Amino acid sequence: MNFIPISLIFSGHGFGFNTNIFETNVINLAVVIGVVVSFVGDAVRELLKNRKETIVNNLREADNRALEAQEKLSQAKAQLADAQKKATEIREQGLVAAEQEKKLCIKQAEEDAARLKQVQQDTIRFQQQKAIQQISQQIVSLALQQVRQKLKMGASAPFHVSVNKSKIDLFKRSL
């Protein structure tokens, strides 16, 4: 083997100590980075790749959720529009029904008023007829009494009885 003399090594050439610290640090840093990149680089790349895939998947899921939320919002808006339309229809039907009910109530009230007026007229007529009949009976009774009195004064008893009977029969027939 060939040995390098020690004097050559310590003379600044060869395997001696390098007294320039900056160059040494740069070389050491390059070696460390090279070792780190060669050994740890694959793991870091794999970690970054996995993180990238996770982020991409999260973004896709977020987009899907956003689309679903948009669809649900559209459905909710459609349902709201339908509900408002139905509410308007129900309100209109209620107004129509209320108007019909109002007309029906007015008609029934008018019919009831007409019926009450008719009953009132009938009652008045009945009471008038009853009063007329009572007055007629009283007039007839008074007339009969006066006739009896006149006949008693101017006629005999049998004649008086026969005239009274005939007059009473005539009066009864006329009623």
Swiss-Prot record:
Record function comment: F(1)F(0) ATP synthase produces ATP from ADP in the presence of a proton or sodium gradient. F-type ATPases consist of two structural domains, F(1) containing the extramembraneous catalytic core and F(0) containing the membrane proton channel, linked together by a central stalk and a peripheral stalk. During catalysis, ATP synthesis in the catalytic domain of F(1) is coupled via a rotary mechanism of the central stalk subunits to proton translocation. Component of the F(0) channel, it forms part of the peripheral stalk, linking F(1) to F(0).
HAMAP family attached to this UniProt entry: ATP_synth_b_bprime
Family in the record: Belongs to the ATPase B chain family.
UniProt entry keywords in alphabetical sequence: ATP synthesis, CF(0), Chloroplast, Hydrogen ion transport, Ion transport, Membrane, Plastid, Thylakoid, Transmembrane, Transmembrane helix, Transport
Anything else known: In plastids the F-type ATPase is also known as CF(1)CF(0).
Protein's organism: Tupiella akineta (Green alga)
Protein name: ATP synthase subunit b, chloroplastic
Protein origin, superkingdom: Eukaryota
Lineage: Eukaryota, Viridiplantae, Chlorophyta, Ulvophyceae, OUU clade
